[in-house]
Amino acid sequence: MTRIGTPLSPTATRVLLCGCGELGKEVVIELQRLGVEVIAVDRYANAPAMQVAHRSHVINMLDGAALRAVIEAEKPHFIVPEIEAIATATLVELEAEGFTVIPTARATSLTMNREGIRRLAAEELDLPTSPYHFADTFEDYSRAVQDLGFPCVVKPVMSSSGKGQSLLRSVDDVQKAWDYAQEGGRAGKGRVIIEGFIDFDYEITLLTVRHVGGTTFCAPVGHRQEKGDYQESWQPQAMSPKALAESERVAKAVTEALGGRGLFGVELFIKGDQVWFSEVSPRPHDTGLVTLISQDLSQFALHARAILGLPIPLIRQFGPSASAVILVEGTSTQTAFANLGAALSEPDTALRLFGKPEVNGQRRMGVALARDESIEAARAKATRAAQAVVVEL
């Protein structure tokens, strides 16, 4: 039976969030609504989730000793990683010592590294994936490209949000794709995965929640990416009943193998009735921001319920819905957003401005959300709302 105490008192139920981006911010808001005391931790001050947490700490998240010191001082009931770049070996140790990591320390560890999760899916679970090779050197990488042929995709084994990812179409792309992958990895230069290109019809994120009552799926989320970065998403993505059933089978197999409780974003490629596993995040997914307008329980509310052991009897989907990101390019520590009245002038629209303290280059600073009679209309409406926002640097 779940029991939640009073925040900032001896009875408090404490959650420590590792990583404080826009997804973490929404998770904190949902936990706050349930009376949970939230401690936010990230590598820079005033990160979005810190702005809505009870208190925060700034540390190098890859420094195991620093992470351990904060966790031992705060004594959280739940440790919730929101990003991949964390000292996962320390989380494994802390879990063995009695701390609860969401969903599990093993899941966090395996999914931090594309190699761990790909080998689990393809070799242990025998799920359909693209053909692949791993390489540590340019020579091994070149051989892998030759073996798989063009087009193929290269990614650092440790990166997030599409960083370092390239589609190779010819020999001319081989060197520059290698260089870009080496720049984009989270741990600097290193190992890459080379994947044979799947000529898919579309890709989806199947938001899958493991909770006290079992496993529940949200309606499939379709999305469009550029250079591996999400630009827009929509729900529900139209699929054949056979493809949807196979997607749920694959998502259940992967999330069951990872274990624990929480929401997972399972990325899949679809062609006709065929389904291939791509990746999984053991936490809310950026493409799932659409659920802030498309469902009665957003992916963040679902994650909060699952973490706390609360039931999820039903997820109500409100019909064709879409999200479009607000990308900002430039350098500023005092970004402002104008023309918001125009952005919100149509019915069934919403905005989320993330409150990121700075932009240096290109950064996702907000998202526009919309519902309409069809997916096409919802996408167009969300894009209009996003484009109406005037950014002042």
Swiss-Prot record:
One of its GO terms (cellular component) is cytosol. N(1)-(5-phospho-beta-D-ribosyl)glycinamide binds at E22, L23, E82, D286, K356, R363, R364. The keyword Hydrolase does not apply. It catalyses: N(1)-(5-phospho-beta-D-ribosyl)glycinamide + formate + ATP = N(2)-formyl-N(1)-(5-phospho-beta-D-ribosyl)glycinamide + ADP + phosphate + H(+). InterPro entries: ATP-grasp, ATP-grasp_carboxylate-amine, ATP_grasp_subdomain_1, PreATP-grasp_dom_sf, PurT, PurT/PurK_preATP-grasp, PurT_C. Pfam families: ATP-grasp, PurT_C, RS_preATP-grasp-like. GO terms for biological process: 'de novo' IMP biosynthetic process. ATP binds at R114, K155, S160, S161, G162, K163, G164, Q165, E195, G196, F197, I198, E203. GO terms for molecular function: ATP binding; magnesium ion binding; phosphoribosylglycinamide formyltransferase 2 activity; phosphoribosylglycinamide formyltransferase activity. Mg(2+) binds at E267, E279. Residues 119-308 form the ATP-grasp domain. Keywords: ATP-binding, Ligase, Magnesium, Metal-binding, Nucleotide-binding, Purine biosynthesis. Belongs to the PurK/PurT family. This is Formate-dependent phosphoribosylglycinamide formyltransferase. It comes from Pseudomonas fluorescens (strain ATCC BAA-477 / NRRL B-23932 / Pf-5). The gene is purT.
